[in-house]
Amino acid sequence: VYGMLFKFL
């Protein structure tokens, strides 16, 4: 889940 959020940043 966190990976997706980081990719968005």
From Swiss-Prot:
Q: Which organism is it from?
A: Cupiennius salei (American wandering spider)
Q: What is this protein called?
A: Short cationic peptide-4f
Question: Where do the coiled-coil regions begin and end?
Answer: none
Single GO term (MF)? toxin activity
User: What keywords tag this UniProt record?
Assistant: Secreted, Toxin
Q: Which family does it belong to?
A: Belongs to the cationic peptide 04 (cupiennin) family. 08 subfamily.
User: What highest taxon heads this organism's lineage?
Assistant: Eukaryota
Spell out the GO cellular component terms annotated for this protein, sorted alphabetically and separated by semicolons: extracellular region
Which subcellular locations apply to this protein? Answer: Secreted
Tissue distribution of the protein: Expressed by the venom gland.
